[in-house]
UniProtKB/Swiss-Prot annotation:
<dbReference type="InterPro" id="IPR046342">
    <property type="entry name" value="CBS_dom_sf"/>
</dbReference>
<feature type="transmembrane region" description="Helical">
    <location>
        <begin position="506"/>
        <end position="526"/>
    </location>
</feature>
<feature type="transmembrane region" description="Helical">
    <location>
        <begin position="535"/>
        <end position="555"/>
    </location>
</feature>
<feature type="transmembrane region" description="Helical">
    <location>
        <begin position="97"/>
        <end position="117"/>
    </location>
</feature>
<feature type="topological domain" description="Cytoplasmic">
    <location>
        <begin position="1"/>
        <end position="96"/>
    </location>
</feature>
<dbReference type="Pfam" id="PF00571">
    <property type="entry name" value="CBS"/>
</dbReference>
<feature type="domain" description="CBS 1">
    <location>
        <begin position="600"/>
        <end position="667"/>
    </location>
</feature>
<keyword id="KW-0407">Ion channel</keyword>
<dbReference type="GO" id="GO:0043231">
    <property type="term" value="C:intracellular membrane-bounded organelle"/>
</dbReference>
<keyword id="KW-0851">Voltage-gated channel</keyword>
<keyword id="KW-0813">Transport</keyword>
<feature type="transmembrane region" description="Helical">
    <location>
        <begin position="141"/>
        <end position="161"/>
    </location>
</feature>
<dbReference type="InterPro" id="IPR014743">
    <property type="entry name" value="Cl-channel_core"/>
</dbReference>
<feature type="transmembrane region" description="Helical">
    <location>
        <begin position="378"/>
        <end position="398"/>
    </location>
</feature>
<keyword id="KW-1133">Transmembrane helix</keyword>
<keyword id="KW-0677">Repeat</keyword>
<keyword id="KW-0812">Transmembrane</keyword>
């Protein structure tokens, strides 16, 4: 082989261009049924019998990834040298200030949502009860139905206007983003506004939805917005937040926002932190724990202060969108622990059943209804009609009971007003059992189910309520309205928990059914979402007492084990249905015998360190790859020695601002007018398309020195690596691209996130 060191730079560039003319296909190994890769499970989920379909793979291929790794280039290193201790403290202090504002804003949003929901629900029941008190059954139903339909119509209409990302809980999208997936517009202003308005209306409409999931999405969107503080539409890019405009810092603030949203929804700051750690965040640090806890406390305090601190009552113990009071009474005996374990078993079975039906229902919606706004609107209105009819007329099924028969001993919620029942069409002094559970808001229903008395409800109404709640929770999940699942699942769990508690109290005296309702709620939540520590802490924070800790822990752990035996959590299935390429913490066992050379793309497009503009334009026009290894020709022909990696967006910025020169390439060329601040500012924006750049012949013959801008510390692996170890690098370091080199440091392949599925 002849030496290439003495060739002119233009000839060496042409040689590299010819060597790299073939564009790698990141899916070339997926179509070969005989390949080692295809013979194993191609998905990171735990179910052994699942494989991604070609359509699912293609959808995942079209989804881009985020850049969590630091771009350690020459500009960045020079900036590090200029950074003093004072500037570092300023950036750190700025993060705490952002957290403070994030907590206050999310707390204010939670307060506004609760106040508006109370207003709308109050108006609905005010007009409905006007006809109920006059014995006008038909008029009362039509009023009840009409208002519910109006709220659902407006809620669904808001989703149609704002986009599908404003519907449901938004947790799958948040999990995907925090895992490294770029879900476009999921945290944009339109999705945020649509989510808030749709949530207020859907939660007021009587549908079996809750506020906690959307609040997590809302908190994440606020965290993303306030940390970036920019507007591409208005061309607003203040330099004050420049150092935070990167995917890594944005990811941290989204994690904080997700925790803050839950903390504001439940008034549970510790539960919010644990939720972000256990469920949504894929990357965590000790510093992030401190900031998340601080922000959650600020959000919970802000909501609480606005709800109670401004008013006449000085009490500050009852917080959140959902509040259940507190008790210091010890309400169970250790001989009942076996019964609590049984509740965990039932919660796991019902949770797995819920996930199973939810999967198939959403699959049917995806195939039949698609994204058709008219069909989606019709479905939401139809579900509202059926829900209103059942909740209204089910209250007539059972006979009325005398209010005087209820003996209030005490309650999980000590506020005695929580046990006030709904009279509905019953005579004075009597109440409707199902009406007290179905004809009202979920907060009141849960308070009544948690009340400490065994003669408030009889067994048949509790059974009917549990079945109705489960059925409509399944049906309402996935509608084109904003709504979560925590509260509906708590209602289902409280229903079967109290039913079980009152059943065994027929044979064993001194059984407190209220604690069974509480434990049942925790078991049902763990059964469908498979969280453990987070749920235990949330339930303890809701009741403001640790006396329920042992039974809740038992029920939650058993419920998770039972549910995991049948399927995964509902959020993982939803991510799969939405084709969000989520990397689990560990690869499937079936990939243990796969090498990285089996999945890597071997014909890689590479760039020289000093690249001609003409070559760059041709390469960018001929493919849509998002990163290119940068090489330096070795002493022999065809050698491609790895030097670094550069992103497509960064190349577009360099081309747009004409960072050109016509030197020999012997010295590193650094444009003084394109410093670190300029480079960071421009790369934080959406890059201009190549089609809008017009170059003359002089510019096309010029060169760009990529060395100051490429990431020279990018992670690489040898072609002898196993798939499992490469997977761990992607998962633990938040990588987007991973060049593969041989023993001579030559680029022989490329692996992306999409190659892991």
């Amino acid at each position: 082989m002849g030496s290439s060191l003495n060739k002119p730079l233009s000839d060496r560039v042409e040689d590299i261009n010819n060597q790299s003319s073939m564009i790698y296909d990141p899916w070339r190994h997926r179509g070969d049924v005989n390949s080692t890769y295809h013979s194993s499970s191609s998905v990171t989920h735990r179910r052994r019998n699942h494989r991604l379909s070609p359509l699912e793979k293609q959808k995942m291929k079209n989804i881009q990834s985020l850049n969590f790794s630091v771009n350690d280039n020459l500009l960045q290193r020079e900036e590090y040298e200029k950074t003093t201790k004072g500037l570092h403290l300023k950036k750190t202090f700025g993060k705490w200030i952002i957290c403070l504002f994030l907590g206050v804003i999310v707390g204010c949003i939670a307060y506004v949502i609760k106040m508006v929901v109370q207003l709308l629900q109050g108006l609905k029941f005010h007009y409905t009860n006007h006809y109920v008190s006059n014995g006008l059954q038909g008029e009362a139903f039509l009023t009840f139905l009409g208002i519910n339909l109006l709220f659902v119509f407006l809620s669904c209409l808001m989703v149609i206007v704002a986009g599908p990302l404003a519907s449901s809980s938004g947790i799958p999208e948040v999990k995907g983003i925090l895992n490294g997936v770029k879900v476009r517009e999921a945290l944009g202003f339109r999705a945020l506004l649509g989510k808030i308005v749709s949530l207020v209306l859907s939660f007021s409409s009587g549908l079996f939805v809750g506020p906690e999931g959307p609040m997590i999405h809302i908190g994440s969107a606020v965290g993303a917005a306030i940390s970036q503080f920019k507007s591409s539409t208005m061309g607003f890019y203040p330099s004050l937040f420049l150092s935070y405009r990167n995917d890594r810092d944005k990811r941290d603030f989204i994690s904080i926002g997700a925790a803050t949203g839950l903390a504001a929804a439940f008034g549970a700051p510790i539960g919010g932190v644990l939720f972000s750690i256990e469920e949504v965040s894929s990357f965590w640090s000790r510093q992030l724990t401190w900031r998340t806890f601080f922000t959650c406390v600020i959000a919970a305090f802000t909501t609480n202060f606005l709800l109670q601190g401004i008013g006449s009552s000085p009490d500050m113990h009852d917080t959140g969108l959902l509040t259940f009071g507190f008790s210091r009474l010890y309400l169970f005996r250790y001989s009942e622990l076996l019964c609590f374990c049984f509740l965990g078993l039932i919660g796991g079975l019902l949770g797995a059943f819920f996930v199973f039906l939810n999967i198939h229902l959403n699959k049917w919606r995806k195939e039949k209804l698609k994204q058709n706004p008219y069909l989606r609107l019709f479905e939401a209105l139809f579900v509202s009609v059926v829900t209103s009819v059942v909740c209204y007329y089910a209250s007539f099924i059972f006979d009325c009971r005398y209010q005087s028969n209820i003996v209030i001993e005490t309650s999980v919620c000590e506020d005695q007003s929580n046990t006030e029942m709904v009279q509905f069409f019953c005579p004075d002094g009597m109440y409707s059992e199902l009406g007290s559970l179905l004809f009202g808001n979920p907060d009141q229903a849960l308070r009544r189910l948690y009340s400490r008395t065994n003669n408030m409800f009889t067994l048949p109404p509790l059974l009917v309520f549990t079945l109705i709640s489960l059925f409509f929770s399944i049906w309402s999940s996935g509608l084109w309205v904003a709504g979560g699942l925590f509260v509906p699942m708590m209602m289902v769990g409280a229903g079967f928990g109290r039913l079980f508690g009152q059943t065994i109290s027929m044979w064993f005296t001194n059984i407190d059914s209220s604690i069974y309702a509480l434990v049942g709620s925790a078991a049902m939540m763990a059964g469908y979402c498979r969280m453990t520590v987070c749920i235990v802490v949330i339930m303890v924070e809701l009741t403001e007492g640790t006396q329920y800790l042992v039974p809740i822990i038992l029920a939650v752990m058993i419920s998770k084990w039972v549910g995991d035996f049948f399927n995964e959590s509902v959020y993982e299935h939803l991510m799969e249905q939405k084709s969000i390429p989520f990397l689990q913490s560990k690869p499937p066992h079936s990939t243990n015998n796969i090498r990285i050379s089996d999945v890597m793309s071997k014909n890689v497009v590479v760039l020289p360190e000093v690249c001609q503009v003409r070559l760059l334009v041709n390469i960018l026009n001929s493919n849509n790859h998002n990163a290119f290894p940068v090489i330096n020709s070795g002493p022999y022909d065809n050698q491609r020695l790895y030097r670094g990696i550069i992103l497509r967006d960064h190349i577009l910025v360099l081309l747009f601002y004409r960072v050109f020169y016509r030197g020999t390439g012997e010295e590193i060329y650094l444009d003084e007018n394109f410093d670190f601040d300029k480079f960071t500012t421009e790369t934080s924006k959406s890059p201009p398309p190549l089609s809008e750049m017009n170059f003359d012949q002089f510019e096309l013959d010029s060169f760009i020195d990529l060395r100051p801008y490429m990431n020279s510390s990018g992670v690489t692996i040898h072609n002898t690596f196993s798939f499992v170890e490469a997977y761990k690098l992607f998962r633990n370091m938040g990588l987007r691209h991973l060049p593969v080199i041989d023993i001579n440091n030559e680029v022989v392949g490329m692996v992306t996130r999409n190659d892991l599925f």
